[in-house]
A protein has these predicted regions:
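Accessory helical-bundle/CTD segments and flexible terminal tails appended to RecA-like ATPase motors
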Residues: 1-147
Length: 147
């Protein structure tokens, strides 16, 4: 995920945009940045969209005390929480129920949520276009339910 030289030619402008993108803290700022980039530089290449998506995902994960996100299997992510995460433990069972069959929770020395991001039941079926929206929806639910 990067800003190609063909999208923003000026190194100074590119550096400024990297700084501003790194400062994104929520969905509103993420949407504003997308609009600004399109207004100033035209349609975003896939690499820039990926960069913005990664920054939003990291920001939202940080807000719910996630210290590490790791891909486990093809359509499975592991969210490792900070050991002292201030989450509402009583809200974990309803969250597990909401994502029944797609979410697991364990307390290996630190709290870990394992999330199957794809809603597709068929193995091998390409559901990659839904990766980002499904993960963001899950992080939003974590924020609303647990924090």
């Amino acid at each position: 995920a990067y800003i190609p030289a063909t999208y923003i030619r000026s190194e100074y402008q590119k550096l400024e945009m990297y700084k501003r993108i790194a400062g994104i803290e929520n969905r509103d700022e993420w949407m504003d940045m997308q609009e600004e980039l399109v207004d100033r530089f035209g349609d975003m290449p896939k690499a820039v969209q990926n960069l913005l998506n990664i920054v939003l995902l990291k920001s939202m994960a940080h807000q719910v005390y996630v210290e590490q996100v790791k891909q486990k299997k093809e359509k499975e992510l592991e969210f490792t929480m900070f050991a002292q995460a201030k989450i509402k433990a009583e809200k974990i069972p309803p969250l597990l129920e909401k994502y029944k069959g797609r979410l697991q929770f364990s307390m290996k020395p630190t709290p870990i949520f394992t999330f199957i991001w794809s809603k597709e039941k068929q193995r091998g079926k390409d559901d990659s276009k839904n990766f980002f929206p499904n993960v963001i929806e899950f992080l939003q639910d974590m924020k609303e339910e647990l924090v």
